[in-house]
């Protein structure tokens, strides 16, 4: 049976259909303000002069309060030569639409902030207060948190960088206090030919623990790592490429190892709330006199029962003849390195935001940047903060869908 050919009318003709393509957003010009930090023990600055130079050369304006980079060993002249506007007027800095801080927003900042500004800063969950969130909401602030900014690999680059600094610094500090002839043991952290290596216990196999382990092994120390997450212990060994001694946190095994160690590093992490105390005071009492405890997780309560918060000015105290170093924000003690690491993340992000037409336009496409938003135009968009402070939560996706582009 033959197929019947369709009859095509002579009036039929083809017409070009218009393809609906999205119009590319015009690039935006950013006006950024960086105030001098007054928060306790905060020495970092969020953008180094080299990053400011790149931003200025791309047509953006950066206004920096005088001496903002002083604690990171960057002078006003460094920033001026990079193209920044230097001012002694704090009010002038806080007039800018985008404010970047290296310390979390605190109560003293609230009167200075303007309506509808964008603030990029750490959140510091352990110190955040409900009143601060309410004040930000009242001024319809859009806020991004350092801790929430994510990259294409799914990691949190600023958190990772600060953790790497803290882990490496922990071993340098432990070596310094062990060598101290006054209260330390007068030993070299590591080992030399013919002398048994010093023994280091690291509690926690996250980024801090891994960085501390790398530093200790590089110095020649004998390292033992504890963590209750077997996956993290396996990942640690894979990343190191070295079969380091590992164990889950079993109190009897941990107590036995602490009795003979020269240095113990607390590097546990907790996504919500306080880290657990895994080293009791009785365990510390049995440690060798002159040994050192570096409690990196003191900002989340500390994992040693004997830990008490100290400062960069008075970093240590002696308890049961054991030196305790319990300074929160260790990275701030290495301010220039930490500032460089933060700047390496923020500068490319700011350029990308500007090239895509500003923050609102960028949020449509960049899910990593979207993850960093915890408040959008006065609406709390972070579920954890909403539950923790009993405040109304609004899905950021809904806010973007209903906003005009």
How should these model regions be labeled?
Residues 17-135, 139-141:
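An N-terminal-biased, well-structured beta-alpha scaffold segment characteristic
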Residues 41-46, 108-112, 271-279, 303-308:
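Glycine/threonine-rich flexible loop motifs
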């Amino acid at each position: 049976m033959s197929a019947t050919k369709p009859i095509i009318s002579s009036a039929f003709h083809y017409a070009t259909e218009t393809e609906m393509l999205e119009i590319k957003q015009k690039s935006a010009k950013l006006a950024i303000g960086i105030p001098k930090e007054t928060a306790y023990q905060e020495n970092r600055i969020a953008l180094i002069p080299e990053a400011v130079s790149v931003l200025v050369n791309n047509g953006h304006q950066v206004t920096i309060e005088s001496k903002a980079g002083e604690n990171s060993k960057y002078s006003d002249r460094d920033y001026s030569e990079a193209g920044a506007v230097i001012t002694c007027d704090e009010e002038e800095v806080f007039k800018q639409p985008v404010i970047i801080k290296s310390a979390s927003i605190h109560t003293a900042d609230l009167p200075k902030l303007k309506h509808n500004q964008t603030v990029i800063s750490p959140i510091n969950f352990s110190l955040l207060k409900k009143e601060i969130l309410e004040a930000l909401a009242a001024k319809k602030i859009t806020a991004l948190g350092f801790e929430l900014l994510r990259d294409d690999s799914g990691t949190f680059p600023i958190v990772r960088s600060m953790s790497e600094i803290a882990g490496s610094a922990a071993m340098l500090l432990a070596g310094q206090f062990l060598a101290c002839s006054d209260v330390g043991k007068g030993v070299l952290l590591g080992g030399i030919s013919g002398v048994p290596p010093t023994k280091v216990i690291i509690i926690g196999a996250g980024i801090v623990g891994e960085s501390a382990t790398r530093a200790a092994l590089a110095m020649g120390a004998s390292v033992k790592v504890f963590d209750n997450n077997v996956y993290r212990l396996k990942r640690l060994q894979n990343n190191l490429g070295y079969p380091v001694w590992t164990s889950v946190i079993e109190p009897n095994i941990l107590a036995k190892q602490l009795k003979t160690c020269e240095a113990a590093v607390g590097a546990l992490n907790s996504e919500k709330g306080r880290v657990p105390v895994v080293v009791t005071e009785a365990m510390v009492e049995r440690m060798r006199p002159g040994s050192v405890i570096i409690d990196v997780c003191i900002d989340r309560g500390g994992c040693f029962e004997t830990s008490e918060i100290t400062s960069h000015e008075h970093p240590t105290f002696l308890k049961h003849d054991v030196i305790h170093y319990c300074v929160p924000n260790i990275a701030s003690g290495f301010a220039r390195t930490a500032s460089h690491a933060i700047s390496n993340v923020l500068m490319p992000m700011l350029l990308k935001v500007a090239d895509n037409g500003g923050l609102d336009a960028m949020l449509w496409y960049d899910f990593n940047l979207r993850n960093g938003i915890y408040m959008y135009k006065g609406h709390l968009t972070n579920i954890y903060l909403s539950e923790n402070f009993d405040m109304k939560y609004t899905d950021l996706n809904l806010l973007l869908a209903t906003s005009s582009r």
